[in-house]
Structures are given as structure tokens and as C-alpha cells.
């Protein structure tokens, strides 16, 4: 994502509009790392909110666009699992004011072989190899990604990089004078790149499409099971299917029992189940985001849904069991009061000496 915004900035600077274009537009349900990268690059970030059904508002985008806009940076489908059907209109609107369009394809798991960034007219995009192409997650994602650009942005690609010559051999090419240079040391985590490439080549075009279709099927099957649990809901797009994930809410259960989504998630670890953490920012109350992908069987999805239902039952009948979880882990319940108080934060030794 940093490479994307760095190339966008270099493009506008090369065209003499670097000082003019100081704003980046994103959506509230796009990955927050897009807004963070733009902010770190010195841009003012404008966030567009969805309409009542959860779809990114095209009218709100057009109202925010101006000659000061450097780019739109959006995830599609968004983290709600909702695909923006007007994505081409979004890109065209950005181009109409001279801005570029950056596509965060972190949620491409459900659209492989169905649609492409090029089809919507994007100028630059990236994939999360650990979310889409079978590489290890690596505690938040290994330091390797795949960026793709239009011809207009090709001169700004990071360098040096590995290229394929006309005779099929590979070589290391230095970046040109417009290149943003090296984004990270070496070429990232090479084993992750090799594994992703091997995974793609092993599946082929038909296999990638099958993976996407299975991911969508698994997600919508799990959604039907989860929405059958009293206290769970899926805000927005009422009655409509989602792509590869859903941002659910435990708000109804929380109002009834006082047990939060975080407490339910921690209790799930006692059953050896996934503890959800990816639902920032907290726009959906008491959120939990599930993304089953193509990897799980129906039996595994049934087991997960049944465990959710069991913990929801515990929240009503034995809430202290949930509130004091985990009970079956090496580290039991910990308090996070310090994390919620900036006055106690000490992320450096100097800060620790100053505060303690």
C-alpha cells in the first residue's frame, strides 16, 4: 500500500501537480491501512461513508472530489463483504478530476477469475499474498506483496526489481530516474513470493475461479448458520448475499447480556477456534468479521457455527464463564486497562523512564 501511494505521489510531482493534489479519498470500510499510508505520505484523508444499505455512496464521492484530489484508495469488496456495483463509476469520477485510482485487492479471494482491476479502469493495485494466494499469514502478513500498475505508472515502479527478458531468462533491473526506489530491503520475503507463484501456477485459471467460487459459497453458507444464532446480525444489504466475508454484530446479545464481542472471541479460543480481531474501525457495533475462504469443509464450518452458538448460550446462562475466559490456555485472562490509557503507554525505553 505504501508503494501505491508513493507511486501516486511521484506521478503527480512529475506532472507538476504535487503541491496542488494534497487529498486522498477512501471509504470507511476499506482497509484502514489505505488511509494510514496516505496520511504517512503527507496527504489529508477524506473518508466516504456508505448509504443505508452499506454501499459506498457515489454522490458522496463526487462531492469530495476536486482538483486537490490525488487519488481514491478503496478496497472492493469492502470489509463488510459487500461489492461496490458502481466501482467503474467511482474510477471514472476520479479520473474526471485528474486523480488516480488505487485498488486494494486484499479481499480478492472471492472475485478471482470473475473481475479484474483493469476492467474497472484502476491505475494501480496490489494483492495480499497471505490472504489470496496461499502464503503464511506471518503475524499480520509477511513483508511481500504484488503490485500492478497501468502503463502510465510503470516508470514509477520500485526498483531494483526482477524482470523477464525476451528470451525467457530473468535479470535484475535498476529503477529508472522516475522510480520511487526500494520500498524494503532485498525483494521482500522471497519464499512467500515463490509459494504464491507456485500456488497460482498449480491452480491455473480454472482453479483460481474455483477457489473464488468456493470461498463465496463457504462464506454464504456460514452466514446462514451464524444468522440463525439469537443475538447475531449482519448490518447492511438486508437479505442480500456477501462475497468472501461478513462483518457481523453481537450488539443484540451485548444489550441482552453485557457480554462483548471481544469477550466472546476470547472464549472461542478455549474451543481451539479463531479469535476475530479484524474489524477496525468500530462502525458496526460489537463487530466480528469472519472470512472462511475456500479452505474449510462444510463440517468445519458447521463446527465453528455450533461453537459460536454454544458461547452465545453461555453468555446468557453463565456469563462469568465467558467474561473470565480463556480457561484452557497457557495464559489465562489478562486485563488491558493499560492499553486503553494513553497516559500509561510506554512503547520506548525513554517513555518508560519518563512515565514510571
Which functions belong to the PLM regions below?
Residues 141, 188-195:
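Catalytic-loop motifs flanking and including active-site residues across diverse enzymes
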